């Protein structure tokens, strides 16, 4: 059996795409909201929203910069990346990101 790190998400962006430029290229960062609906024990309908941090580089970063705006519905495929960094106070912080490998632009806002 082959082991994989693959995720597919369909949702709406929560903010404008942020572009971070480097000497050898750029990355695009944006948050994506996905929602699930269920009925709780009291018979009430509940909506639960999860926020995901998307990161793309190369041609995908260019596409996101040009075509993705706040509220845009998109579908992405990618992999889950866990990383850590030290903040300004020297405290180790952990972050989970989705490294985008494919993107499909869906309906408008």
Predicted segments, located by residue:
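Single-stranded nucleic acid-binding surfaces, predominantly the OB-fold ssDNA-binding core
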Residues: 1-109
């Amino acid at each position: 059996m082959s082991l994989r790190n693959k995720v597919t998400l369909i949702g709406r962006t929560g903010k404008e795409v942020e572009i971070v430029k480097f000497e050898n290229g750029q990355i695009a960062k944006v948050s994506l909201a996905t929602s699930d609906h269920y009925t709780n024990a009291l018979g009430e309908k509940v909506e639960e929203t999860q926020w995901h941090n998307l990161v793309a580089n190369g041609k995908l970063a260019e596409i996101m910069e040009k075509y993705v705006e706040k509220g845009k519905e998109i579908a992405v495929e990618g992999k889950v990346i866990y990383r850590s960094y030290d903040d300004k106070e020297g405290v180790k912080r952990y972050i989970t990101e989705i490294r985008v490998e494919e993107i499909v632009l869906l309906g408008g806002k």
